[in-house]
């Protein structure tokens, strides 16, 4: 018998309402927590969007980062490490993509030159992202083909991808918008699928929920 899905969202409750609402619309049991024992009981992990990652965690001084929450960063890294060790599925959204990248040794550009095309302007901005992997077996191509329209609310981006992470899609300015691990059930996107469920976001979230532990 297949184990029921239980999704742990690692964040502060005041910041995760959109995520819980989206997954409950997909009839998924989910909860927000900062307790690692509670999180480890879940079948799936979500690392949500939020402020910027503490630059020291990827070997830089602060030159453009803000809304930093180092305590939360460290708890999210701890949860990620726990799920990696158990081979359970992980999804990173926005900041979550950047956390996953940093965990695997990647770096972040703290303020991209094209930030005005990506950042929050009182609402999400919309732009296309394009398949960029050499393979057609990655999740992005399987779900969306060569391109899809996404929402955007960020001013930072991946500089160098971490070890074993494959960029699967990019924006028109070459910003990496999606990653997957080459052997673990880990994927991440720079956009916010939870806010565009009826415009293709549900496809990605359902795919993530279909993944199982190794």
Each predicted region: which residue ranges?
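Short, surface-exposed charged micro-motifs
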Residues: 157, 168, 178
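A glycine-rich beta-turn/hairpin centered on an aromatic-Pro dipeptide
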Residues: 152-155
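Active-site-proximal beta-strand elements of phosphoester/diester hydrolases
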Residues: 187-191
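N-terminal beta1-alpha1 cap of cysteine-dependent amidohydrolase-like domains
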Residues: 1-93, 101-109, 113-144, 159-165, ...
């Amino acid at each position: 018998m297949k184990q029921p899905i239980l999704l742990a969202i690692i964040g502060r409750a005041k910041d995760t309402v959109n995520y819980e609402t989206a997954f409950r619309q997909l009839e998924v049991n989910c909860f927000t927590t900062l307790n690692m024992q509670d999180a480890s009981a879940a079948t799936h992990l979500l690392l949500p969007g939020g402020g910027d990652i503490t630059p020291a965690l990827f070997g830089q001084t602060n030159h453009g980062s803000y809304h930093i929450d180092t305590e939360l960063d460290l708890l999210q890294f701890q949860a990620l490490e726990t799920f990696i060790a158990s081979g359970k599925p992980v999804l990173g959204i926005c900041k979550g993509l950047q956390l996953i990248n940093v965990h695997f040794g990647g770096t972040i550009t703290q303020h991209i030159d094209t930030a005005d095309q990506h950042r929050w302007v009182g609402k999400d901005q919309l732009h296309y992202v394009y398949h960029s992997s050499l393979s057609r077996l990655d999740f992005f191509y399987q779900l969306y083909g060569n391109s899809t329209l996404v929402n955007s609310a960020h001013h930072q981006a991946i500089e160098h991808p971490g070890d074993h992470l494959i960029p699967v899609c990019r924006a028109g300015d070459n910003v990496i918008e999606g990653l997957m691990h080459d052997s673990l059930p880990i994927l991440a996107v720079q956009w916010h699928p939870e806010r565009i469920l009826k415009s293709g976001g549900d496809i990605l979230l359902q795919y993530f929920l279909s993944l199982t532990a190794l």
